[in-house]
Amino acid sequence: MKDLRLPEKMSRAKIKQLLNEIKFSQERSDELRDKFGWRYVQSERPKTGKSYNKLRIYTFHTPKYKYIVHIEEYDYDYFLISFFPKLNIDFYVKQQKLASMGKKYYDEYSYLTKENIPLKILTLLVSEMKNILKDKPYSSFGYFGAPDYKMGEKTDLFNTKRVRIYNELLNGEFSQTHEVKSLETYSGGLILNKAVLQEYPNLELYCEDILKSHL
């Protein structure tokens, strides 16, 4: 008789293999920094209408794209991280037109590069988070992704299995000092310093509200 449980076993094995592959390695991170040319560009004070205290800008390159990384610094040593490929002006003009017509459209966060490198990028970001913690040990972090396309409604924001995978890596690295909160509705998460959270119970709401304001 055919073993109907085989696909489930294979699925579990695949997940276990994937989780083993995403364990953070500083050696691997250093290798990726060199390979992708990770570089600090500059820090900026907030522009009009922005609520962060400081913006740190980084770049790195893949064979197809140049990526921009933004790390926004807020009160309570909260850092919100985002990244996106640098796209030409024609892309934005076209998407603006689609949005104005009520059609599905993309932004820099939801544009699909099809490079299949999100875990490599996350490794780079974890490495930078560790660097920040060396300087500010009570820091907390947030990150967010995006749906495959936008329709200008809250229903765009959907659960994603990728977030669970990402948070496995984050839990493995930060669980001793931080609580990792999965925000699958926003395709993102929070990494909250336990000591700060104990002293300021509203920290989670503060960080989540800032993350949501970007979506």
Residue ranges and their predicted role:
Residues 2-4, 12-215:
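Non-catalytic substrate-recognition and accessory regions of acyl/acetyltransferase enzymes
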